[in-house]
From Swiss-Prot:
It comes from the Bacteria. This is Elongation factor Tu. Mg(2+) binds at residue 26. It catalyses: GTP + H2O = GDP + phosphate + H(+). PROSITE patterns: G_TR_1, G_TR_2. It comes from Exiguobacterium sp. (strain ATCC BAA-1283 / AT1b). It is an enzyme of class 3 (hydrolase). Residues 19-26 are annotated as: G1.
Length: 395
């Protein structure tokens, strides 16, 4: 049986769940799938399928990013269930970068917790433009005043990070109740999805720009060749287009895309916002790796030295407790990978304090596909300590 074609008649939007560990992100993801599938007479994606990343089994925490799809009457959604645990902020960064909007899940029994704040901050850094709130586990709280208090706390926290805390939708429900088929909670999931439909605008896709896709994963299909997966950041990729593999190596490699698929369906082309697998001609599994980008030939080049405007997280935001000096060597997280780099401070600046905003020069130990405006995080030992944006390429 051949693969069925992907239906493009509905607008396509990328969303995802964020929030503190055990507040119910994965349960809500499964509940949305269950409630919408029931309404449309389709098969739902089960909790175990979403939670079923291989690493999962040992620790009962979601590590790998799960991608599922579902539809409302108005839209087709691709949903990433972002890992909630602090150890896996790395995945949060790759996950959150894939969202046109996020559903922030906060348990009514706990209220906002440290990772709630961290995920809101990361959403602000990686450019998640809209957040809708789902207050979960409200069936476990009898006190109406307490619910109002938690809602107020969430709204204030969002406002603190420049999201419109007073205006964005907050839906109160029970993900588990909805997943178990209880009508009153199923209704709340429908209400949530109506809010997502209405509040998260249809994204302005970057289809007019030159094609680029950060490589998230690579695997080989026997007899067909090498497939690179990722989310198309901009432009359009058509079957038989020539593309370049850029970054991490000195010279860029040219190849031809011989096939495009999304959600196991074949496409004639992929466009900005699509999560795809691109089949590459004449490329071996070792010629390409996570952290590189696929791009229209000549449109983006690899660089290792640039000026950037950075914000260094304060101690309160989970950043460093002490200043850093010249020759500081953290990791710089670009799109899907960490690269070590050396920081050169501007003349007359001896040190940079947590909470500072400064322009400085960064020299990476390997090249990355970058251009003005490319965003990145600064990390040490897996912990985000800053965020930045490229302002000028030097070499």
């Amino acid at each position: 049986m051949g693969k069925e074609k992907f239906d493009r008649s509905k607008p396509h939007v990328n969303v995802g769940t964020i929030g503190h560990v055990d507040h119910g992100k994965t349960t809500l993801t499964a509940a949305i799938s269950a409630v919408l599938s029931k309404a449309q007479g389709k098969a739902a994606t089960k909790f175990d399928q979403i939670d079923g990343a291989p690493e999962e089994r040992e620790r009962g925490i979601t590590i790998a990013t799960a991608h599922i799809e579902y539809e409302t009457d108005k839209r087709h959604y691709a949903h990433v269930d972002c890992p909630g645990h602090a150890d896996y902020v790395k995945n949060m960064i790759t996950g959150a970068a894939q969202m046109d909007g996020a559903i922030l899940v906060v348990s009514a029994t706990d209220g906002p917790m440290p990772q709630t704040r961290e995920h809101i901050l990361l959403s602000r850094q990686v450019g998640v433009p809209y957040i809708v709130v789902f207050m979960n586990k409200v069936d476990m709280v009898d006190d109406e005043e307490l619910l109002e208090l938690v809602e107020m706390e969430i709204r204030e926290l969002l406002s603190e990070y420049d999201f419109p805390g007073d205006d964005l939708p907050v839906i109160k429900g029970s993900a588990l109740g909805a997943l178990n088929g209880e009508a009153q909670w199923e209704e709340k999931v429908m209400e949530l999805m109506n809010a997502v439909d209405e509040y998260i605008p249809e994204p302005v896709r970057d289809t007019e720009k030159d094609f680029m896709m950060p490589v998230e994963d690579v695997f080989s299909i026997t007899g067909r060749g090498t497939v690179a997966t990722g989310r198309v950041e901009r432009g359009v990729l058509r079957v038989n287009d020539e593309i370049e593999i850029v970054g991490l190596t000195e010279e860029t490699k040219k190849t031809v895309c011989t096939g495009v698929e999304m959600f196991r369906k074949l496409l004639d082309y992929a466009e900005a916002g699509d999560n795809i697998g691109a089949l590459l001609r004449g490329v071996s599994r070792d010629d390409i790796e996570r952290g590189q980008v696929l791009a229209k030939p000549g449109s983006i080049t690899p660089h290792s030295k640039f000026k950037a405007s950075i914000y260094v997280l304060s101690k309160e935001e989970g950043g460093r407790h002490t200043p850093f000096f010249a020759n500081y060597r953290p990791q710089f997280y670009f799109r899907t990978t960490d690269v070590t780099g050396i920081v050169h401070l501007p003349e007359g600046t001896e040190m940079v304090m947590p909470g500072d905003n400064i322009e400085l020069t960064i020299e990476l130990i390997s090249t990355i596909a970058i251009e003005d405006g490319t965003r990145f995080s600064i990390r040490e030992g897996g912990r985000t300590v800053g965020a930045g944006s490229v302002t000028e390429i030097i070499e």
